[in-house]
Amino acid sequence: MNLHFETPNLLLRPRTLEHFEACIAMDLDPQVTRYLPGPWDGGEEHRNFVRSRIERDFGESCGYWAIFAKSAPEEFLGWVSFIPYEAVGPELEMGWRLVRRAWGKGIASEAARRIVEHAFLGAGVERIVADAHALNAGSLAVARKVGFRFVRDGEFEGLPSKFFEMTRADFDARRR
């Protein structure tokens, strides 16, 4: 995947090994990963997980994009993803993660909106899913702002989660 995107304020570049250390550093902030299962300790398992997600080919239209502000194009702010659910599918899911200094500024919503647009208009998908920990108010707000509809409460890897979806009809209705 070599798709680059822009929004009014952001640059979205395919995430590469150039972004590896910035991703690890972001994950080491316990506030960033407090609602996420996994070993976020900088150890071998953590590093291998991040490396595998960076190096994996998710297909022509899917992947992870590193987020940068146009005003500071070398300052890593986080990532947004559009990949097969849990990396295996068949459903396609959106995700996002930001460094703490980027929280509360509309960055995740702006980046996610652009990737949603790509998913429906560029990749031609019919449905996208997303989930977030039930207490992660920031991610839940992003999902709603972007246009995801709440579907159900459940669990993800043993953690209380809220599950969302957006269909092509939902996307089209928001564009009118």
Residue locations for each model-derived region?
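GNAT-family acyltransferases
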Residues: 1-101, 117-118, 122, 131-133, ...
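Conserved acetyl-CoA-binding loop-helix of GNAT-fold acetyltransferases
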Residues: 96-98, 104-121, 137-145
